[in-house]
Amino acid sequence: MTSLPKPINCVAFDCGNSSFRTVLGTFDGTRTNMEVVLQVSHNTIEINGLYYWDILHVYEGLKQGLKEAFLRAGHIDSIGICTWGVDFGFLDENGFLLANPLCYRNPIGEEQLSGLSAEEKRWVFDKTGIQNNRINSLYQLTGIKGLMPDLFGIASHMLMIPDLLSYFFTGEKFTEFSIASTTQLFDVKSMQYAEDVFDRFAIPMKMFKPLKQHGEVIGMLKQSIADELRIPVCPVICVPSHDTACAVAAVPAMEEDFLFISSGTWSLIGTELQTPEITQEVYQRDFANEGGVFNTITLLKNSAGMHILQCIRRDLELDGKKFTWDEIVRLAQNYQGAPGLFDPNSYELFNPKNMISAIRGLMKDDNATIEKVLASTYTSLAYTYRRTVEQIQEVTGKDYSSIYIVGGGSQNAYLNQLTADLTGKKVFSGPKEATSLGNIGVQLVSHISGFGLSDIREMVRNSEPISPFHPDPQRDRQLIDVRYRDFYENQ
């Protein structure tokens, strides 16, 4: 690909809903050798009925990961930070953190969204290109303004979670394009904040910070942090700070038109476009035009993902039954009957006290075995993927031949094969560390002249194995389609 005088060492901070990790990537001019140097679990903390993120725990863990990366590599050329979307923290006028950030799984967003008329919801979509969702920052902010007026009143700056972490490391306040688009306060047509939406919901636009471009240097690591960790200062680079955008940057596609599923806590199902699709069809099908790498658009839908399976596993552990993920898959495969079908995006599954009980309730089968619950969950997820894929084809007018599944969930071969069987499309799984690879790829743009998106994807193909899954010709296509129609008509 390119000749380098020496390898480039990039550190990717990849923060998900259940863990955060520090990944060291060493690019030799052709491929990136990646190593997870530290991974730490984290969860929300419930206080007085609200769920918070322990952002200081995350920050401290990332510092320790940076130290470990330096010890292993000997030098660090740059850092990039990406996390989940929609959540944020407040700073006062002096730049001090006012409170731990609230989690999107709180009910305050739902209460605000439900108060809007159909006309208002369509107006917000037309202004931003983003679907109305209870988790969006817009509705969280509106809820906080009513629930916590004192906190909202003294907040001078609002930073999205990845930009807040970048601020901790550099002291620079900014907003990145892809994460800004998840707020539903950003106009993806003009690539600017949606001033009309700020005015309509009485949210001060001055709380939001200027935008930076991908590959741009945000600032240098604070000298005080470098001294504490006993490492040299290095630049922090503006990467797509929404983890989905980083993952899509690392989709190993060679074709221009492709489908992707970024599979993790959520399943983000979509395609990459050059311009947004803000139409009646997109609105009715509940798609979002989110910001992607280098000002592309990811037309996608947030759908339930591994969170459901993680909660099932947690419920089993609380009942004294511990299973590995391989054992979870075998339990699903052992079920010989017809799986029950349910909508994985049902509100009842958003944050239930017990996921297994909630699924049994949706299936109207209180005595369903754990094997049936798991088989039904996997099948319902795959049918949801099929439905979303068909909707993407309808709104874009394109017929896609392949689906690329990236992220941690791409390692689930059982679900990958189900997806191929139930959609009738070729599936390619991997890379598992797509978010980190995309993060590192965009960092390389700041180091290598002319390095772009096609180079990032070539680097990914050179770096990680990609596994193909083809529709099983032995499966009864007619039965698959009949069950799918039943599933579709019951939604």
Predicted segments with their positions:
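Glycine-rich beta-strand-to-loop/alpha-helix junction loops that act as flexible
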Residues: C82-D87, H214-G215, S263-W266, S402-S410
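Conserved phosphate-binding loops in N-terminal lobes of ATP-dependent enzymes
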Residues: Y59-G80, R134-T142, P149, A155-S166
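Short, basic and Ser/Thr-rich N-terminal targeting/leader segments
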Residues: K6, G16-S18, H75-D77, C82-W84, ...
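Short beta-strand-loop/turn "lid" adjacent to the catalytic site in phosphate-handling enzymes
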Residues: F70-C103, Q131-I135, S166-D187, P210-Q213
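Active-site core segments that coordinate phosphate-bearing ligands/cofactors
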Residues: T2-P5, A12, S117-G129, Y139-M160, ...
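Carbohydrate-associated surface elements
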Residues: N106
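N-terminal glycine/serine-rich phosphate-binding loop of ATP-dependent small-molecule kinases
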Residues: M1-A99, D126, A226-V236, T423-K425
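Short glycine-rich phosphate-binding loop at a beta-alpha junction
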Residues: H75-T83, H157, P210, V395-G407
